[in-house]
């Protein structure tokens, strides 16, 4: 039996079949006590992949203006995957966090700043000691405005890296969001339920310059 190289993206023909039944989702976010699925009319949604989603979700729920956060899977082929399937490298999904936010309190540009400054966006199919395509850096955009802001922020951060002497090319993927599949309940707000749990989040000491 051939082994799977988890640092390589797979094709759709090689992906696990998944299932038609969605993962059960808790009714309320355990930190904010808001709906895990509903998006109020005045709120917006952003989706980020920065490595293991446990620490990423906590980073965002701690910010002002955040209505809810959710850990999940996106960017692959397998419908309604399980955590075990994603970790196998056979779904092509990334671990990601869906952020519902109030743009009157915290802007998308501010979320992008948190994204760039709190992980290493130049590691390809890994994040620190977490190795595999599910740990890749990605921004999944939901509007043309998010796409433009994300692309412009990438250019600014790449330049800031060079000015710090880091000549690596950013590997962050910026693509329109496809289906977001909620992770199992054990993974939702994991570091609230397990305060001493693993968090692999960490930046590279570079700040995102503000938009011009």
Swiss-Prot record:
Name of one Pfam family that matches = PMSR
EC number(s) of the enzyme? Answer: 1.8.4.11
Q: Which domain of life is it from?
A: Bacteria
> Positions of the region Disordered?
1-21
Please provide the record's keywords in A-Z order.
Answer: Oxidoreductase
Give the catalytic activity: L-methionyl-[protein] + [thioredoxin]-disulfide + H2O = L-methionyl-(S)-S-oxide-[protein] + [thioredoxin]-dithiol; [thioredoxin]-disulfide + L-methionine + H2O = L-methionine (S)-S-oxide + [thioredoxin]-dithiol
The protein's GO terms of the molecular function aspect are: L-methionine-(S)-S-oxide reductase activity; peptide-methionine (S)-S-oxide reductase activity
Q: Record's family? A: Belongs to the MsrA Met sulfoxide reductase family.
Protein task = Has an important function as a repair enzyme for proteins that have been inactivated by oxidation. Catalyzes the reversible oxidation-reduction of methionine sulfoxide in proteins to methionine.
The protein in question is named: Peptide methionine sulfoxide reductase MsrA
Highest lineage ranks of the organism? Bacteria, Pseudomonadati, Pseudomonadota, Gammaproteobacteria, Enterobacterales
